[in-house]
């Protein structure tokens, strides 16, 4: 929140409660619920945003194919939201898991941003399929 300056705003959305932070508007809700997205859009008003960060992950069931599908669905929702809300040069950071649907999602990212960078966090276990994709400079492709 310190990086956005006096005119910037930070919004945080989570299903779990979060302790208040200065200069952060927190919305408790599920990103998959239309009522939550409506509340977020109402808070944004007519403003476009510079950056969307999605660290969403579903509750893991242990059924790999189901867990992967849910992860990719959340990433797709976040990309759809980003394309609607980002300004013309906005950026999007999203956590995904490599597996079924990853290549298609990567293609959608490449259609939507001028450059896509992949990063595996050092904190992520070596055998984990977790990876972050950073879409730089939205260019308006339709995923």
Model-predicted segments: where are they?
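Helix-to-beta-strand junctions that scaffold the AdoMet/dcAdoMet cofactor pocket
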Residues: 4-6, 86-87
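S-adenosyl-L-methionine
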Residues: 6-7, 13-61
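Short strand-turn motif at the edge of the Rossmann-like AdoMet-binding core
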Residues: 15-16, 56-57, 95-98, 121-122
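Class I S-adenosylmethionine-dependent transferase superfamily signal
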Residues: 40, 81-82, 109
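Glycine/threonine-rich flexible loop motifs
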Residues: 60-71
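A short glycine-rich, Lys/Arg-flanked "PGG" loop and its adjoining helix->strand segment in the class I
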Residues: 70-88
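Conserved beta-strand signature within the Rossmann-like core of class I S-adenosyl-L-methionine
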Residues: 84-96, 119
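Class I S-adenosyl-L-methionine
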Residues: 98-143
């Amino acid at each position: 929140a310190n990086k956005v300056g006096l005119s910037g705003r930070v919004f945080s959305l989570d299903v779990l409660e979060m302790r208040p932070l200065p200069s952060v508007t927190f919305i408790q809700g599920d990103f998959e619920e239309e009522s939550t997205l409506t509340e977020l859009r109402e808070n944004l008003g007519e403003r476009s945003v510079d950056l969307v960060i999605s660290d969403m992950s579903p509750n893991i069931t242990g059924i790999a194919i189901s867990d992967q599908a849910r992860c990719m669905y959340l990433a797709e929702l976040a990309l759809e939201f980003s394309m609607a809300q980002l300004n013309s040069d906005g950026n999007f950071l999203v956590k995904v898991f490599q597996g079924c649907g990853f290549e298609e999602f990567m293609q959608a990212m490449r259609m939507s941003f001028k450059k896509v960078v992949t990063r595996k966090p050092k904190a992520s276990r070596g055998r984990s399929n977790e990876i972050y994709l950073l879409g730089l400079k939205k260019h308006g492709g339709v995923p």
